[in-house]
Amino acid sequence: MIVVVAPGQGSQTPGFLEPWIAEPRFREHLQRISDSVGIDLVKHGTTSDEDTIRDTAIAQPLIVAAGLLAFEGLVPDNGKLAIGGVAGHSVGEITASVLSGILSEEEAFRFVKQRSQGMADAAALVRTGMSAVIGGDEDALLTHLKDLDLEPANFNGGGQIVVAGELTKLAKLAENPLPGTRVIPLKVAGAFHTHYMEPSVAALHEVAASIWASDPLLPIWTNRDGSLVESGTTFVDLMVSQVTSPVRWDLTMVALSAAGVTGLIELAPAGALVGLARRGLKGVPTVAIKTPDDLAAAHDMMNGK
């Protein structure tokens, strides 16, 4: 079973869409998305600097758009994809919801526009951020986080937990890491997937209630607990609550393994989830789609080559 996964925030880099817009069909697609959300994603994906695309109001629609461009390149001429399911990490769940048929592209960008702006507004209230903690004992780390008034935001598997909170408290964690751990500050603009995002929930819930969600045509796993979700409405509700809840990518990988995954394709901007799969899904072949040149390898995987 081949699974397609979509990355979350922090995977974007300056100019990463440059190779994509060199092809007219991808440039036209990106321009349509830009027009629909009122954000110049062509500019932000090609010439905007690192600080600009760190802004979550820009980063989220940019990442979802990139994933959909890559997915467009995956779909063969006959429209039949040889994949067994989809999943997304954080905002990547919105990408996955389009892939599975839960949301139309238009509805997905209505949702991500509200999600990104609401989370940006919430992040502006308090100076917060996120750091990855590599290694160490999970229980000891969680206890240490409570002592520092920090929260776990992503359980990524393979010994990596992303923590979030006020910048001063993250600095204390970095200054005094637990034995056997490394602390790496992340290039994101807030404490996502924590209580700091609570101010964004009400408006996002209103948008979610106004959009049409179909039941998935492809199996889709949720970040909440790694379970398969069969109701489109339920999946959208989970995406709303996810903004204040930890991403359980570790449980998602456990579920993929149990489902018999034999190959994993990560959509653009790829790299992070393939890296996690090397530790959490050992032995499973992967393809990271970073540019259109990587599509051939993804097609080969889907065709069993």
Feature annotation, model-predicted:
Residues M1-A140, L186, G263-D293:
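FabD-like malonyl-/acyl-CoA
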Residues Y196, L295-M301:
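Short, charged, surface-exposed secondary-structure boundary motifs
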Residues S257-G260:
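Non-catalytic positions within long, well-ordered alpha-helices that form the structural scaffold/packing
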Residues V247-A255:
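A short, well-structured juxtamembrane/interface segment
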Residues R25, L62-A66, K169, A203, ...:
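Charged catalytic carboxylate motif
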